[in-house]
């Protein structure tokens, strides 16, 4: 017997609508579960306004790369933040790669990750909170991208405090502030170059960096907190010619010119008032020590005079030039 088409009554239509709704809910759940198992198994996270914050890590460690997006309910949501303490005390973590989608790294995110040796920070990060790499003592080098404006926020432990294996820090051109305690007890750090953008450095930022020998500033002298270089007895601060607000000491350390420029004028060589001399030109107010010896085969250099290049120029004359068959000169800055 052939059956004709079934006519839906209002009751049947309600049943069909309910079934469609349930199907949509089931489909959403399936899409959520469709997020790659390897990714879901490694991270816990929250969502807010279409963006994801990584809040924890449950993976096996080793080399970890954060995803830049996650598919949630059929939507690709960007990973924009790493929450506070998200990877704290994860002893199995060896390296971490942070994608360009991440804009901020929360307090203590990698606190006490004692086997962390390599960090790649994406070009989207603008701020790094306090304590992020606290006591990551196997971390040896780090590059801070140009996008970062602040290293720490003066709310807790320093960003790199007690990273005792850290030997090299490369700061991007966007960094304006370095918070207190930022590099405290980085005992292997031997030098650091600060970009022109740096305008403030917090208290004790480089305290107990016992291997530190040179701190190089490309810009003007920044404002500082107290005891910036406490315990850094072998360090010297260097600043570039033409920058401002520098005096003979900075943060308790001697401050001297970095890459000073000096030259002599061949046309000025000659005898004046029975003394041989020449004009020295170079960086304004640079102090120059003129040394002399009598031969280059076995040179014994002795200071003859100390000149200050007031206005960028000074004339040197040798009162002893007639006492030797030959007098050879060199210049140095104290």
Model-derived segments and spans:
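Consensus positions within tandem repeat domains that build extended binding/scaffold surfaces
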Residues: 84-86, 106-111, 129-134, 156-161, ...
């Amino acid at each position: 017997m052939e059956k004709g088409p079934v006519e839906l009554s209002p009751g049947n239509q309600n049943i069909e609508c309910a079934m469609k709704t349930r199907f949509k809910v089931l489909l959403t759940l399936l899409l959520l579960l469709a997020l790659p198992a390897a990714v879901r198994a490694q991270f816990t996270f929250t969502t807010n306004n279409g963006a994801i914050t990584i809040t924890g890590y449950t993976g096996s460690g080793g080399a970890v790369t954060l995803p830049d997006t996650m598919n949630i309910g059929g939507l690709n949501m960007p990973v924009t933040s790493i929450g506070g303490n998200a990877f704290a005390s994860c002893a199995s973590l060896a390296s971490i790669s942070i994608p360009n989608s991440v804009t901020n790294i929360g307090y203590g995110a990698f606190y006490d990750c004692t086997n962390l040796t390599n960090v790649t920070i994406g070009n989207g990060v603008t701020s790094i909170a306090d304590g992020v790499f606290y006591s990551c003592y196997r971390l040896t080098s780090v590059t801070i991208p140009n996008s970062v404006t602040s290293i720490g926020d003066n709310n807790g432990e320093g960003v790199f405090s007690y990273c005792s294996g850290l030997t090299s820090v490369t700061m991007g051109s966007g960094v304006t502030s370095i918070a207190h305690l930022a590099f405290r007890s980085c005992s292997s750090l031997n030098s650091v170059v600060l970009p022109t953008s740096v305008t403030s450095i917090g208290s004790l930022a480089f305290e107990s960096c016992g291997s530190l020998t040179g701190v190089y500033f490309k810009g003007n002298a920044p404002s500082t907190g107290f005891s910036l270089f406490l315990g850094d007895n072998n360090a010297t601060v260097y600043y570039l010619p033409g920058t401002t607000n520098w005096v003979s000491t900075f943060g308790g350390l001697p401050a001297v010119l970095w890459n000073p420029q000096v030259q002599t004028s061949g046309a000025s060589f000659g005898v004046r008032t029975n003394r041989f001399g020449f004009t020295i030109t170079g960086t304004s107010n640079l102090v120059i020590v003129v040394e002399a010896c009598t031969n280059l085969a076995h040179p014994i250099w002795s200071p003859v005079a100390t000149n200050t290049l007031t206005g960028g120029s000074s004339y040197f004359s040798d009162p002893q030039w007639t006492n030797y068959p030959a007098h050879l000169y060199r210049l140095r800055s104290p």
